[in-house]
Amino acid sequence: MTATTQTPRHDWSKDEVLALFEQPFNDLLHQAQTTHRAHFDPNTVQVSTLLSIKTGACPEDCKYCPQSVRYDTGLEREQILAVEEVVAAARRARDAGATRFCMGAAWRSPKDRDLETVEAMVREVKALGLETCLTLGMLRDGQAERLREAGLDYYNHNLDTSEDYYDEIITTRSYQDRLDTLARVRDAGLKTCCGGIIGMGETRQDRAELLRTLASLPVQPQSVPINQLVQVPGTPLHGVEPPDPFEFVRTIAVARILMPASYVRLSAGREQMSDELQALCFLAGANSIFYGDKLLTTGNPEADKDRRLLARLGMGFEAHACAQAEAEDLG
């Protein structure tokens, strides 16, 4: 069996990553769990809440997305929310146990006039003691710096899949466009949230290459969301063959081994997962979830259901970052 990796590497080869995927299932999970325990409390999960601050009418053609203006999914377009609405939602999320509040807008790239409103949202949410994350599309020069100055902690920009398979899913922005935005985010001193989607018709080789690309970035993403495709009627990917559940767990495990110090988020698609599958994902090294009954436009398990599942597993929520810092200061 491959030796457990406890320090991040940026030089994984394709063959090495595929070899991880091809291990016997129990061996792979043992390696992933051992790696996980070297960096995290194995019985806690970090909790984020996601809010759509501007919904629909996106000009991009991502084949999985109900927010694209190109597909008839029945989604109603909504203008950007008022700052007060966002703050109220963030306060509810904090009171429910979330430590990070993520805000998403269906834009190709934010306009400067909209960025002013978003900056105000970030400042107000930060004032509640929450970490902040944004996903607004591609960023131009100087925009990441503005968001950092407003107090932003994380910026999400997923690679979605491997570079080889990417053109089968999206044609309106290139893979390099995504890498360029990630570089701007890193250069501005922000933390990156970057992952992909499983179940879009890709092969194991594509999944391996996606994870290898993420692990090979100059700084590995601090947060790695692994989504299972949520099939939405009207999108081109509706009806695609779903991924094998054990292959999904393998993907979580390999992500944990390749990026040992990153939070691996069990992200979209949990509503369609059994409790048993989610438990296997936690065993494989997932240690972050979205909390709340909606993710942008798709469903998510009810908060009480998540609490019951974690209680059955003897797991709990990660302590709030501010509370942890205070405890360390007192200690």
From Swiss-Prot:
Keyword annotations of the record: 2Fe-2S, 4Fe-4S, Biotin biosynthesis, Iron, Iron-sulfur, Metal-binding, S-adenosyl-L-methionine, Transferase
Radical SAM core domain: residues covered: 43-267
Catalytic reaction annotation: (4R,5S)-dethiobiotin + (sulfur carrier)-SH + 2 reduced [2Fe-2S]-[ferredoxin] + 2 S-adenosyl-L-methionine = (sulfur carrier)-H + biotin + 2 5'-deoxyadenosine + 2 L-methionine + 2 oxidized [2Fe-2S]-[ferredoxin]
Amino-acid positions noted as binding [2Fe-2S] cluster in the UniProt annotation, renumbered to this chain: C102, C133, C193, R265
Family of the protein in this entry: Belongs to the radical SAM superfamily. Biotin synthase family.
Job description of the protein: Catalyzes the conversion of dethiobiotin (DTB) to biotin by the insertion of a sulfur atom into dethiobiotin via a radical-based mechanism.
Protein name (Swiss-Prot/TrEMBL): Biotin synthase
Origin species: Alkalilimnicola ehrlichii (strain ATCC BAA-1101 / DSM 17681 / MLHE-1)
